[in-house]
Amino acid sequence: MPTPSTKKKVKKVAEDPLSSSGVSSLSGISSYNIRKISIYKNGDRYHRGVKFVINPRVIKDMEPLLNQVNDRIELSHGAKKLYTTDGKIVNSIKELEDGKIYVAASAQFIPMRYGEFAEKVWKPPSRKHSPIMSSDRIKTARTRSQDPSKRRQPQNSGSSAPTGSGVQRSRSVRTLAEDRKSRRDANPARPNVNGASNAPKKFDGARPKAPPARQTIPKPKKILTTSTTNKKPPTPKRKVSKKVLGAAAAAGVTVVGAAAIGAVAAAKRSTPKPIPTAVSDVSTASSIPIPNVTGAAEILEFPEEEKKIDMATIHRTPTPPVVASRPATAKAPGTPANRSATALEAKSVSQQPTPESSEEEEDEGNGDEDDDEEVEDDEEDAGSDEAEEEPSDEEEEDEETEEEEEEEEEEEEDDDESRVETPASRKSSSAVSFSGSTEEDHKKGDEAKK
């Protein structure tokens, strides 16, 4: 009988059967039927795969194997099935073959070429064979950047033997710094007008800040004022008939000015007509009509210029000049009695101080048409008549000639209506100046020559 010392002691394997040490210890025993397999992840062609060693004495069912696979391979719903590369399901451990590839899946198998593509390992590119960082190119960059006197000969030339072995470090950064320094040495600082040299610019300094933006205050818009805003509203005209003036003279009322004429006209008429709005502004020298801005049809009035008579000059003269009577017309031949009556009437008219009261009366046959004739009544300027300047002699003569022409036209109209005239209705000239009498004397001389 063999002694206990000669008996071969068999060690019990207490290690993990799936570990590499367990495989090495059990590799010599053929009776155990140990198998080595590789399991890949379903749907991942670049998966490296996990190697498993299956001992049928330890692992007798598929459930512990799937638990080990689930711990090593991460799937969305866990490792629930094993497939062959052809897509067949492995139902038991006995179907597993040694050295084969299997795929762990959750539900459905995805056919791919598993195990042929290993996962790529990304590494930085080598500078040894790249065309940009080749040694020849670096040498040309160094020689071009330096001055001819400071150029170095390449190390691989025949004159100098290689001093060291191995891959040399790139000197591109140093080349740029030397290039800038050589440029600065080659171009010295130019002196100023005063003789001081400018300090060289520092390339490493901080970037200068931009100047702050100026705050611009918006200018107020200019409002264009129209010329009509500053003007006073035009004074309305009041229509005064010459018949009213005659009635006032017959009643013994002395008409003194334009305001008095307006008052008499207002008393005479109970319902005055509406005041016109578009009336030209009356100035001391001349009257300028306002243009029609609205574009509507409008009749522009050109009233006669107002005659301003200085009251002081009238009171200084002892006797007013006597105006000669008008010569008789062909339509209404005058008698000596009529001529004397007109002379008396002219004297009475010339003694009146204002030019407005010198307007003559008209026949009653004119009716309502005579009431429509207008006399300008400027109430604002009535009080300042004496302060205004007298018009020139030439303007007075032009005004008098225009008035005489208008009176002659009125006489012709009256003669057509009624041939018979009375001394009261006889027309007389409203001119008080000397120019009117001279024109009448010329007319008389022409008739006498004829």
UniProtKB/Swiss-Prot annotation:
Gene3D superfamilies per UniProt: Doublecortin domain
Classification via SUPFAM superfamilies: Doublecortin (DC)
Matching InterPro entries: Doublecortin_dom (IPR003533), Doublecortin_dom_sf (IPR036572)
Domain Doublecortin, residue spans: 35-115
Keywords: Cell membrane, Cell projection, Cilium, Cytoplasm, Cytoskeleton, Membrane, Transmembrane, Transmembrane helix
Organism (species): Caenorhabditis elegans
Record field: compositional bias (Polar residues): 154-170
A GO-annotated cellular component: ciliary membrane
Residue ranges with Basic residues bias: 1-11
Comp. bias intervals (Acidic residues): 357-418
The keyword Protein biosynthesis belongs to this UniProt entry's keyword annotation: no
Listed SMART domains: DCX
Any Pfam family: DCX
Cellular localisation: Cell projection, Cilium membrane; Cell projection, Cilium; Cytoplasm, Cytoskeleton, Cilium axoneme; Cytoplasm, Cytoskeleton
Gene Ontology biological-process entries: intracellular signal transduction
Signal peptide: none
UniProt biased composition (Low complexity): 425-437
Free-text tissue specificity from the UniProt record: Expressed in amphid and phasmid ciliated neurons.
Name this polypeptide is given: Protein rpi-1
